[in-house]
C-alpha cells in the first residue's frame, strides 16, 4: 500500500516539477518562488503533492505511514522512535523548502507553456480517495501480498 501511494504521489510531484522547469526556465529551487500566485493550478498541485508525500491526513500516504508506524511500535518499539523522528525531520525540511516556492514573492516566467495537468491531478485524486476508501478487492490484494512477503 505504501509503495503504491508513494509512487502515485511522487509521480504527481515529478509532473509538477517538470512543468515548473518549463514555465520558470530553471530547475534551481532558489530561483522559483510564488507558484500559487503566478501559476495557481501548478502551485497548488505541487503543494498538495508535497503535503501528501509528507504523510499528512487525509491523503493515502498518511494511512500507509500510520500502519507502518503503529506496526513498528507494536513489534519493535525502539525502532519506532527513530522512525517517527525521521518522519518529523522530513516534514520540517519539506515545509521549509515549500514555503517560499509556493507562497513567496513570484519570480519571472518564460511565458505560457502548453501542458496538461490531468496526470498531476489524476494521481493526486487517487491518493486522496485512498485516504478515505479502498475497495475490498484491493485491500484483499494488498493483504495477500503482505502475507506472501512475510
PLM region spans:
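Short alpha-helical catalytic segment bearing the HExxH-like zincin motif
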Residues: 2-7
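Interfacial and helix-entry/exit segments of alpha-helical transmembrane bundles
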Residues: 9-82, 108-127
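Alpha-helical transmembrane segments and their membrane-interface exit regions
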Residues: 8-13, 146-150
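Alpha-helical transmembrane segments of multi-pass integral membrane proteins
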Residues: 77-97
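Cytoplasmic/organellar membrane-interface segments at the starts of transmembrane helices
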Residues: 39-42, 91, 95-150
